[in-house]
């Protein structure tokens, strides 16, 4: 059995308006980020990825202004990953100037909150422009994560190098077919943890380019589960050949 170093990435994916109004989703966001801050303060090993879009910080602090010091303290330590986008972008419909402005504002908002994620996070776009690596380089972004818009043919590995129109390139992590929800089963019924991990392990080992794999734990509009606490230790007890830790994308 191949030894793996497993990076657990707690996160959420957030549409600001969809099957609820923007006001309805803002109420849910406030509750979700209340829980995020509480769990991060409870467990110093925990990390949380805030969906790559800094606007969620603005939305949250608009209704929870008293939470600013706590949020900024966690962002400064890198445990709460914010940005680099202002809002997650459709990368093909908007013009290049729109994408640049998006990243400019994201850098400002994330920086003001305490820190910026340096990974170009593009999980939900249905295509990616040829200038992607060049755009990332201009903003000091050192890697990328994509899901849709790449393809998922059998045999695809989990990493590739994306070369832009010039000589710029960056390493890309391509999420598995189940995308950013693939690890949500790890915080469901504890009695099923061994089965859930066994199923995921086989899939990740088959696609892995190196012995490091990233398992996203979250879903659309989901709050983080209390079962995140202690999850690396529970998984290590099941799979003693591998190591488990909470990580951010930059880590």
Walk through the language-model features, giving the residues of each.
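Catalytic-domain carbohydrate-binding cleft regions of carbohydrate-active enzymes
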Residues: 1-251
